[in-house]
């Protein structure tokens, strides 16, 4: 299962995940170097996220006619150039432009990469293959971001982006060497692809993907103040908790892929139900570190166990437009990231406490579960390839 082509995709995934999140640990350094405030530097995070959302459909359309290996290499070239721009940017505006350029490669790479990963294995192993590719993203949170932050703080923030450039070059060479040629691009014209995506069976998993991400990031965005102000953990202790959550994300992602290959709908229903239960318990238990730590690890695992099942569902629901559908689903995840952060902020501004944010995440997860359960009422909305047997 862990083949060299999938490892090549995972290496690229690791680089993309590192460049997306490493900036968060370097905001004070960037702000001081470019003479902007820390909140202004923070826009480099949201600017990247919106670049993914906006760029995903544009790049998917632009690469629709390319063979998939060629498309992946073109996207890695954009990724490398964008990070070179970040490393060399003399001004805040140019750094923002380079971040957005880099983000344009993000959604399409994960989208096309997921299709390629699923095509490289037997049908009963597709979700596992996608989860292995996404393991690069989760490992970026566990290893890449802490290492990149430490490197940037020790050698200057630009050094972190030079390191990401090196990762991108290595991943690009691995794609050249190990991804097979001859993988087709689009199976039809753009009009046909958009018609396929305009049907509810293709839109439903994207709606659920967005809601799953909103649920996660309405809490994750504010996890540090929750741990410090509610649980009473020191700033140094928060770093350790985030590392443990990252391990939970990685394990949950891999386990979700394995379970989804057995029964996709049961994996999603169980994942959302477990997520709701954990978040409700976290609301009551968050004042003590003893229950909070295992609950947060479990929460991260359950949240990322949903990723590969939803990605497979989207690909199978839009067989006439797998690249575009898979890429747009990555845009849906990132739209959920931004929306979740905004929704959590709205709740806090309205008077909610950090302790109450898990309840907000549970509410959104319950809505996602309700949409998922509609497939039991109308099984036809789920592709026959992944529909449970009667």
Question: Language-model features: where?
Answer:
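Conserved MFS/SLC helix-loop-helix module at the cytosolic interface between two early adjacent transmembrane helices
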Residues: 54-93
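Paired small-residue
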Residues: 78, 82-85, 93-102, 290-298
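Helix-loop-helix hairpin linking two adjacent transmembrane segments in secondary transporters
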Residues: 94, 122-177, 222, 226
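C-terminal transmembrane helical hairpin of 12-TM major facilitator-type secondary transporters
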Residues: 266-310
